[in-house]
């Protein structure tokens, strides 16, 4: 049984999902859970992208033990230097360098020749090897590359010291039988293939990322790059949970180190921190994945779950909670439930989360897992409060012009503003904008119920942009949806100020 290495790129390619902007603490929390999940490699980020990205990767490299910690770098010395500076304190560092190899990318994007690309790839791998014994090389857009050139460049980078060669379907163009055949032919034609592992990285533009990954695996790929919940650019990447459970359920002859009972926790954590909801009918981790509405199906499942369920929910860690949390629940019960849901908070954050839980319990008769996840995901999002909401009053109704009065503190100084608007939320946002003189544009606002019932928590999401087009996302929850909307707006503004300043 051959070992299959799981390379998780949730924190790099997954974070490139439109609207996702994880901070340093959120990235670390996800990385710690990925280590519990027992992935083999965590691609922590792209250090050259920004100072914040560099610090987040460095933080993970220093604090997360177990998996190999990889950092992405273009095939240029400046990127490779920065990648190494970020991951050099990891127990097991890897530099992952890449360059495009398809003619359309070489000619239209890089403005180079094949020979120049080959030379740059070899130079990059040799340069990375000066720092790190473990170097991965990716041929961007490999699927649309000339096969003979692909063989030539892979042979050259292996000769230069690459320990892993990665074959990406960058635009999600391949069909499963084509992609499997490509991997088989590469393994047969690369003369020094015994000196490196073959990896694949599939995108989901045609909905085939998981199928293509599995086809590659059965044709000899030894590493698969994937993300939790299939996050990623455009239509996303191959979903880690789908690949792993397909191998487990169908008993394919590959050894996978993933602790499947951590899958559900990891999925929920990533969804809560990124703000990207899991579609209800998502395979493995969707809310409806183990739901049965048909009477015939329900009868069968009651008699024997295996009639319609090929996976035992407990296998992926879906908790069977017998504990109902409410206002009489203690901290130990609360902490135990957090751990079952995949959260491990330091004492100070646990105290604050428990305090907020008690406040919510006074307003709601029964606290659900979704309530807890909403509370804690907000707790993890540690952003300095340059602006803090001190007072909020809204007057609205039929025949009344919606009016918001707010008091915001900035460096100890209180700012009071009053504004009218086209509805209570609009009035609140106009009042905040008037008080907080930070250039920005409101790109998106949404409000949803976290749970059912009239006492449900409402979650507000606000997306802002600065003058350079950078996106900042704020989220907040409250049983008062107007309060949640105001807090979400301020959190997005605080994130903007933290990263860009006030100008």
Swiss-Prot record:
Pyruvate carboxyltransferase domain location: 4-264
The protein's Enzyme Commission number: 2.3.3.13
Sequence segments annotated as region (Regulatory domain): 388-503
InterPro entries named among the record's database cross-references: 2-IPM_HCS-like (IPR050073), 2-isopropylmalate_synth_dimer (IPR013709), AIPM/Hcit_synth_CS (IPR002034), Aldolase_TIM (IPR013785), LeuA/HCS_post-cat (IPR054691), LeuA_allosteric_dom_sf (IPR036230), LeuA_bact_synth (IPR005671), PYR_CT (IPR000891)
Main location group: cytoplasm
Cofactor(s) listed in the protein's UniProt record: Mn(2+)
Gene Ontology annotations of biological process type: L-leucine biosynthetic process
Highest rank taxon of the organism: Bacteria
Pathway: Amino-acid biosynthesis; L-leucine biosynthesis; L-leucine from 3-methyl-2-oxobutanoate: step 1/4
Keyword ATP-binding carried by entry: no
Matching CDD domains: DRE_TIM_IPMS
Gene Ontology molecular function terms on file: 2-isopropylmalate synthase activity; acetyl-CoA C-acetyltransferase activity; manganese ion binding
Keywords, ordered alphabetically: Amino-acid biosynthesis, Branched-chain amino acid biosynthesis, Cytoplasm, Leucine biosynthesis, Manganese, Metal-binding, Transferase
Subcellular location: Cytoplasm
Catalytic reaction annotation: 3-methyl-2-oxobutanoate + acetyl-CoA + H2O = (2S)-2-isopropylmalate + CoA + H(+)
This protein's GO CC annotations: cytoplasm
Subunit structure, as described in the record: Homodimer.
The family this protein is said to belong to: Belongs to the alpha-IPM synthase/homocitrate synthase family. LeuA type 1 subfamily.
Stored PANTHER family: 2-ISOPROPYLMALATE SYNTHASE 1, CHLOROPLASTIC-RELATED, HOMOCITRATE SYNTHASE-RELATED
Function: Catalyzes the condensation of the acetyl group of acetyl-CoA with 3-methyl-2-oxobutanoate (2-ketoisovalerate) to form 3-carboxy-3-hydroxy-4-methylpentanoate (2-isopropylmalate).
Protein name, as recorded: 2-isopropylmalate synthase
Originating species: Dictyoglomus turgidum (strain DSM 6724 / Z-1310)
Gene that specifies this protein: leuA
């Amino acid at each position: 049984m051959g070992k299959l290495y799981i390379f998780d790129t949730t924190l790099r390619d997954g974070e490139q999902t439109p609207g996702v902007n994880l901070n340093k603490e959120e990235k670390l929390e996800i990385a710690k859970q990925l280590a519990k999940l027992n992935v083999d490699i965590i691609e922590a980020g792209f250090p050259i992208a920004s100072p914040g990205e560099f610090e987040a990767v460095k933080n993970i490299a220093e604090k997360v033990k177990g998996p190999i910690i990889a950092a992405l770098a273009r095939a240029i010395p400046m990127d490779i230097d920065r990648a190494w500076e970020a991951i050099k304190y990891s127990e097991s560092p890897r530099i992952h360098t890449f360059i495009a190899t398809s003619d359309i990318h070489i000619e239209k994007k890089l403005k180079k020749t094949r020979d120049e690309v080959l030379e740059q790839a070899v130079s990059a791998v040799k340069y990375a090897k000066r720092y790190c014994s473990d170097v991965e090389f990716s041929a961007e857009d490999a699927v649309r590359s000339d096969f003979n050139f692909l063989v030539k460049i892979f042979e050259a980078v292996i000769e230069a010291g690459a320990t892993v060669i990665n074959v990406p379907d960058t635009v999600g163009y391949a069909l499963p039988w084509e992609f499997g055949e490509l991997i088989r032919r590469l393994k047969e034609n690369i003369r020094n293939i015994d000196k490196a592992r073959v990896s694949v990285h599939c995108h989901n533009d045609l909905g085939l990322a998981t199928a293509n990954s599995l086809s590659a695996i059965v044709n000899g790929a030894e590493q698969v790059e994937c993300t939790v919940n299939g996050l990623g650019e455009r239509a996303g990447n191959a979903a880690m949970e789908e690949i792993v459970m397909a191998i487990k359920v169908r008993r394919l002859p590959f050894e996978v180190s993933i602790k499947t009972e951590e899958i559900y926790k990891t999925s929920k954590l990533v969804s809560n921190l990124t703000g990207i909801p899991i579609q209800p009918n998502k395979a493995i981790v969707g809310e409806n994945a183990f739901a049965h509405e048909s009477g015939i199906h329900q009868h069968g499942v009651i008699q024997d779950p295996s009639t319609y369920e090929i996976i035992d929910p407990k296998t992926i860690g879906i908790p069977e909670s017998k504990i109902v949390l409410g206002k009489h629940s203690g901290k130990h019960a609360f902490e135990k439930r957090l751990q079952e849901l995949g959260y491990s908070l330091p004492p100070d954050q646990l105290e604050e989360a428990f305090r907020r839980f008690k406040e919510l319990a006074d307003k709601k008769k029964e606290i659900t897992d979704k309530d807890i996840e909403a509370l804690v995901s907000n707790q993890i999002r540690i952003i300095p409060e340059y602006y803090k909401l001190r007072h909020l009053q809204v007057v609205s109704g039929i025949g009344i012009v919606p009016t918001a009065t707010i008091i915001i503190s900035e460096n100890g100084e209180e700012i009071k503003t009053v504004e009218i608007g086209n509805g209570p939320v609009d009035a609140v946002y106009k009042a905040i904008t008037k008080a907080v003189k930070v250039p920005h544009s409101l790109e998106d606002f949404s409000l949803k119920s976290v749970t059912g019932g009239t006492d449900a928590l409402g979650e507000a999401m606000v997306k802002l942009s600065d003058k350079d087009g950078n996106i900042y996302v704020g989220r907040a929850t409250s049983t008062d949806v107007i309060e949640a909307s105001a807090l979400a707006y301020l959190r997005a503004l605080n994130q903007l100020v933290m990263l860009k300043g006030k100008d």
